[in-house]
Design a protein with these regions (language model features):
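Short beta-strand-to-loop transition segments that serve as allosteric relay/switch motifs
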Residues: 63-68, 108, 132-142, 148
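Allosteric cytosolic regulatory segments
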Residues: 149, 153-160
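Amphipathic coiled-coil signal-transmission "stalk" helices
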Residues: 7, 11, 25, 161, ...
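A short, aliphatic-rich beta-strand micro-motif
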Residues: 79, 116-124, 133
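Signal-transducing coupling segments at domain and membrane junctions
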Residues: 95-117
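GAF sensory/regulatory domain recognition
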Residues: 48-88
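Flexible loop/coil segments at beta-strand boundaries within sensory signal-transduction domains
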Residues: 111, 123-129, 138-139
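Helix-loop-beta substructure at the N-terminus of cytosolic sensory domains
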Residues: 11, 24-61
Length: 179
């Protein structure tokens, strides 16, 4: 695969490919599928979950989930609030440090465990967070490095814009159908 270089991905090439594909997609299902597949393949992670705000509610998408589009556990609100404050990728350990109460830390750790993820990257919105990309451990067992986090943050920013555009386009199509 041309996105890998000696067992690792080519950061610039992957970013160029994902950016190009995101700029041409107007279908939310296609965007979700492309993001999940590209990130899972390039970073060789065990799991990729997208959490996206749709019609006022967060929804889960990814491989290995029971149903696509189901609502996440209630503890997701804790994590969203942390991401709104931090505005950057955050691990389960770092997220727990942001919480004062032991009960909240345990609930958050339980959420990460239930989802099978160890890193979350916010999808920024005009106001707050429109969702997140949640990643499981790398298959190699390696930790995420700064280059990974920079890449994921850039992808998340572009993905948030593409998702917002697709949602606006779908709303416009629905309005035109109803006329």
């Amino acid at each position: 695969d041309h996105l890998f270089f000696r067992g690792r991905y080519d950061y610039r090439e992957l970013l160029r490919e994902i950016s190009g594909r995101l700029s041409t997609l107007l279908s939310l299902p296609q965007i979700k599928e492309m993001l999940i597949g590209s990130i899972a393949g390039a970073l060789q992670v065990e799991k990729v979950i997208l959490v996206i705000m749709e019609k006022g509610r967060f929804r889960l998408y990814g491989e290995g989930l029971g149903r696509q589009g189901e609502e996440p556990p209630g503890e997701i609100g804790l994590l969203i609030r942390i991401l709104e404050r931090e505005k950057r990728p955050i691990t389960v350990a770092a997220a727990a440090k942001r919480l004062a109460g032991r009960e909240d830390r345990e609930r958050l750790a339980g959420l990460f465990k239930q989802l099978g993820v160890m890193l979350v990257i916010p999808l920024p919105a005009r106001e707050g967070v429109a969702g997140m990309i949640a990643l499981g451990q790398k298959r190699s067992g390696e930790l995420f490095v700064d280059e990974d986090l920079e890449l994921l943050s850039t992808i998340a920013n572009q993905a948030a814009t593409a998702i917002e555009n697709a949602q606006s386009y779908e709303a416009l199509e629905a309005l035109n159908r109803d006329l």
